[in-house]
């Protein structure tokens, strides 16, 4: 996000893309304005939290009127720097990695996987979803400073050694889909997404906190 934007809580920052996606859908449907209650129902965030999130950016709406969809959409596009494409490198072209390459964030205008790496000779030299696949040995040669983000879908045992190489190459952010908990310098941001843990958590809540009928 732009350095000119006010410092906001990380929890709020994580919700901004969610708001933006919903606003794009509203705009596409021709809706001109939306209330915090309508936003709340759509994104499953309570209205008070939405109003507080929006308050960090000043007066985005009017009491009794709600929010102008076109204005909010334009505002969040600038805030999220939607007009600037962030290039991403993917590591590990297995089932999950292949799915990412075929999808390649088609709903996001500002994120694009531009290269992938693997050690499987059958995959090296091919393209998946239009993205070239290189051998992991070529990492230092291929990865450049214009690619600040890496997605890891490699075996857990290989994750830390790969991360160490990425740090040396100047990667600034890592989306980690491996079970490994990565050690990185303080200036590197890592988001861990462990699908097995998320599934276990969901099953636990279903069993122990059933929704009211």
UniProtKB/Swiss-Prot annotation:
Pfam families: CoA_binding (PF02629), Put_DNA-bind_N (PF06971). One of its GO terms (biological process) is response to redox state. It comes from the Bacteria. GO terms for cellular component: cytoplasm. Residues 18-57 bind DNA. Keywords: Cytoplasm, DNA-binding, NAD, Repressor, Transcription, Transcription regulation. The keyword Methyltransferase does not apply. The keyword NAD applies. One of its GO terms (molecular function) is DNA binding. Signal peptide: none annotated. NAD(+) binds at residues 92-97. Its main location: cytoplasm. It is found in: Cytoplasm. Modulates transcription in response to changes in cellular NADH/NAD(+) redox state. PANTHER family: REDOX-SENSING TRANSCRIPTIONAL REPRESSOR REX (PTHR35786), REDOX-SENSING TRANSCRIPTIONAL REPRESSOR REX 1 (PTHR35786:SF1). NCBIfam families: PRK05472.1-3, PRK05472.1-5, PRK05472.2-3, PRK05472.2-4, PRK05472.2-5. Belongs to the transcriptional regulatory Rex family. Homodimer. This is Redox-sensing transcriptional repressor Rex.
């Amino acid at each position: 996000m732009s350095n000119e934007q006010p410092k906001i809580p990380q929890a709020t920052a994580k919700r901004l893309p969610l708001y933006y996606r919903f606003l794009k859908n509203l705009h596409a449907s021709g809706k001109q304005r939306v209330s915090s209650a309508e936003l709340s129902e759509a994104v499953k965030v309570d209205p008070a939290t939405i109003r507080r999130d929006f308050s960090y950016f000043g007066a985005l709406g009017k009491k009794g009127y709600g929010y102008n969809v076109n204005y909010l959409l334009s505002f969040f596009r600038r805030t999220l720097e939607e007009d600037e494409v962030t290039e991403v490198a993917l590591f590990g072209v297995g089932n999950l990695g292949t799915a990412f390459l075929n999808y390649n964030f088609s709903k996001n205008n500002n994120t694009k996987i531009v290269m992938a790496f693997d050690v499987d000779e059958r995959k090296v030299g091919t393209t998946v979803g239009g993205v070239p696949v290189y051998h992991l040995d070529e990492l230092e040669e291929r990865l450049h400073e214009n690619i600040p983000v890496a997605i890891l879908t490699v075996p857990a045992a290989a994750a830390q050694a790969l991360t160490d190489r990425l740090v040396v190459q100047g990667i600034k952010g890592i989306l980690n889909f491996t079970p490994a908990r990565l050690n990185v310098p303080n200036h590197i941001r890592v988001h861990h997404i462990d699908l097995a843990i998320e599934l276990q958590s969901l099953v636990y809540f279903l069993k122990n906190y059933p929704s009211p009928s």
